[in-house]
Amino acid sequence: PDYLQLARA
């Protein structure tokens, strides 16, 4: 999964 995008949730 995209961790960078998950951190922006």
Curated annotation (Swiss-Prot):
Signal peptide: none annotated. It comes from the Eukaryota. Disulfide bonds: none annotated. GO terms for biological process: neuropeptide signaling pathway. Keywords: Neuropeptide, Secreted. The keyword Acetylation does not apply. GO terms for cellular component: extracellular region. It is found in: Secreted. Transmembrane segments: none annotated. Its main location: secreted. Belongs to the FARP (FMRF amide related peptide) family. FMRFamides and FMRFamide-like peptides are neuropeptides. This is Extended FMRFamide-2. It comes from Austrophasma gansbaaiense (Gladiator).
